[in-house]
From Swiss-Prot:
Catalytic activity: sn-glycerol 3-phosphate + NAD(+) = dihydroxyacetone phosphate + NADH + H(+); sn-glycerol 3-phosphate + NADP(+) = dihydroxyacetone phosphate + NADPH + H(+)
Organism: Prosthecochloris aestuarii (strain DSM 271 / SK 413)
Originating gene: gpsA
HAMAP family hit by this protein: NAD_Glyc3P_dehydrog
GO annotation (BP), single: glycerol-3-phosphate biosynthetic process
GO cellular component: cytosol
This protein's name: Glycerol-3-phosphate dehydrogenase [NAD(P)+]
């Protein structure tokens, strides 16, 4: 089996290494040719995943068309807002029978589409039953360090989800399956927004009570949006929901939590982003989800509060006061 991973960030590189170590022939494609050449020369992703040497079965692809044409499985590991642009590069390729696995987490800005929908819309030759996502609490730093990790492979087709499970499953990377691809994608995307809120609480100096409230009420927002889009309410209790939400809100590795923490300390969004080496998906996902929730009539007060702080320059203290002084309402 030949697998092509599109995107040589920390997560794409981690998965490429994992798959190569399982014995698959793996090609890793980077968007920038000069970066691809550096990866081929050093046999290590010094910029995004330092200290992890590439196994012999991992090749660096210079030509995305050749790499995708030869592949049985294509893994999309580019930033969420670059999925459409990257898929358009594959438009002239015969993708019949190829398994598509998206691992980016986000909602497309403007269209409000889930990333599996973006893939299907962009690549008309792809069978919808062959599209899947791989989500869950899985920081690249820990997976590449062979620390125990559990994730979920989701597809509307159970056989496809099981195939992804078989491909990625290892002794330390346990993969479950789920056919609720809508719920899995929504949970895995919106949790990044809630993590920004959790980081803001850290930056201000709030305690455990505030963090617990953000996580719990954030989960309620995820559940409402997922239900409005046809997702199974049970999915939010799984790995892509509560699992990924907890790790993203609490972890030192979380880029989204870090962005929030810096905002809470008084830095501007532009300043924080300009000094980061990697993408914090939750920033643009916040914009996309506010637009989507407005269109669907879904109440998401934490998400809207994060939006106000990030994009409307609302003072953090004022935003939190407004959030806390809303009219009382039932919990469930």
């Amino acid at each position: 089996m030949i697998i092509t991973v599109l995107g040589a960030g920390s997560w794409g590189t981690t998965l490429a290494v994992l798959l190569a170590n399982k014995g698959y022939a793996v090609s890793l494609w980077a968007h920038r040719p000069d970066f691809a050449q550096e990866l081929a020369r050093t046999r290590e992703n010094v910029k995004y995943l330092p200290g992890v040497t590439f196994p012999d079965g991992l090749e660096i692809a210079q030509d995305i068309n050749a790499a995708a044409t030869d592949a049985d499985v294509i893994v999309a590991a580019v930033p969420s807002q670059a999925v459409r642009e990257t898929m358009e590069l594959l438009a002239g390729i015969n993708l019949d029978g190829k398994l598509m696995v998206n691992v980016a987490k986000g909602i497309e800005l403007g269209s409000g589409k889930r990333l599996s929908e973006v893939i299907l819309e962009t690549l008309s030759g792809v069978d919808p039953s062959m599209v899947s996502v791989l989500y869950g609490p899985s920081h690249a730093e820990e997976v590449s360090g062979l620390q125990p990790t559990t994730v979920v492979a989701a597809s509307s087709n159970l056989d496809t989800a099981k195939r992804v499970q078989e491909i990625f499953h290892t002794r330390m990377f346990r993969v479950y399956v789920n056919t609720d691809i809508v719920g899995v994608e929504i949970a895995g995307s919106v949790k990044n927004i809630i993590a920004i809120a959790a980081g803001i609480a850290d930056g201000i100096g709030f305690g455990d009570n505030a963090k617990a409230a953000i996580i719990t009420r954030g989960l309620a927002e995820i559940s409402r949006l997922s239900a409005a889009m046809g997702g199974d309410p049970m999915t939010v209790s799984g790995l892509s929901g509560i699992g990924d939400l907890v790790v993203t809100c609490l972890s030192k590795h979380s880029r989204n939590r870090y962005v929030g923490e810096q905002i809470g300390k008084g830095r501007s969004l532009d300043d924080v982003i300009s000094h980061m080496n990697m993408v914090a998906e939750g920033v643009l996902t916040t914009k996309a989800v506010v637009e989507l929730s407005n269109r669907l009539g879904v109440d998401m007060p934490i998400t809207r509060t994060v939006y106000a702080m990030l994009f409307e320059h609302k003072p953090v203290e004022d935003a939190i006061l407004d959030l806390m002084t809303r009219d009382p309402k039932p919990e469930l």
